[in-house]
Amino acid sequence: MAANIAVLAQEESHNPLLPETYDIVWSIVCLVIVGFVFWKYVLPMFQKVLAERTEQIDGGIKRAEEAQAEAKAALEQYRAQLAEARTEAAQIREDARTQGQQIIAEMKAQAQEESDRIVAAGNNQLVAQRQQIVAELRADLGRTAVDLAEKVIGESLADDVKRAGTVDRFLNELDTIGANSAAGK
């Protein structure tokens, strides 16, 4: 029994938490084999996937930056076109205002010319009518004056030349009397 105790004592001196040496060696060999396979085959695939993702992300960022730059350029172009359109609209409004004022001035000038023409035509017509009326009145007055003169004088004024001279003298005397009475007022 003492021998059993000694064997048990020897067995007890061994730490139960530590594995046997052969287990450690085989574990290291397996770890190296798995590590080699992982390093040779699996890790490059992970790196390839990560590189592709990084490239996609970088490409996406680059495309986003390009799109943002294009949008910024388009916005600047839009703003420039808008400013140009506003300037052009202001110029068109100013041109329209100027043309409107010119048209109004032309229409006023035409209206004034038309008015002057109508007034001149009316004055000419009045002068012509006045001359016609004066001529008709002179003729009537002449006949009436000759008739009265024949009755007053008692002789016939059959001679046209005498008649015309007498009528003209009478009318001239009437004009002078009318002018003197108008100047006296």
From Swiss-Prot:
Pfam families documented for this protein: ATP-synt_B
Main location per the UniProt record: membrane
Signal peptide range in chain numbering: none
GO cellular component: plasma membrane; proton-transporting ATP synthase complex
UniProt KW Coiled coil keyword: no
Keyword Hydrolase (UniProt): no
Membrane topology of this protein: Single-pass membrane protein
Keyword annotations from UniProtKB, A to Z: ATP synthesis, Cell membrane, CF(0), Hydrogen ion transport, Ion transport, Membrane, Transmembrane, Transmembrane helix, Transport
Location in the cell: Cell membrane
Transmembrane stretches, start-end: 24-44
GO MF, one example: proton-transporting ATPase activity, rotational mechanism
InterPro entries referenced in this protein's UniProt entry, alphabetically: ATP_synth_B-like_membr_sf, ATP_synth_b/b'su_bac/chlpt, ATP_synth_F0_bsu_bac, ATP_synthase_B_chain
Family: Belongs to the ATPase B chain family.
Function: F(1)F(0) ATP synthase produces ATP from ADP in the presence of a proton or sodium gradient. F-type ATPases consist of two structural domains, F(1) containing the extramembraneous catalytic core and F(0) containing the membrane proton channel, linked together by a central stalk and a peripheral stalk. During catalysis, ATP synthesis in the catalytic domain of F(1) is coupled via a rotary mechanism of the central stalk subunits to proton translocation.
Description of how the protein assembles with itself and partners: F-type ATPases have 2 components, F(1) - the catalytic core - and F(0) - the membrane proton channel. F(1) has five subunits: alpha(3), beta(3), gamma(1), delta(1), epsilon(1). F(0) has three main subunits: a(1), b(2) and c(10-14). The alpha and beta chains form an alternating ring which encloses part of the gamma chain. F(1) is attached to F(0) by a central stalk formed by the gamma and epsilon chains, while a peripheral stalk is formed by the delta and b chains.
NCBIfam families recorded: ATP_synt_b, PRK05759.1-3
Designated name of the protein: ATP synthase subunit b
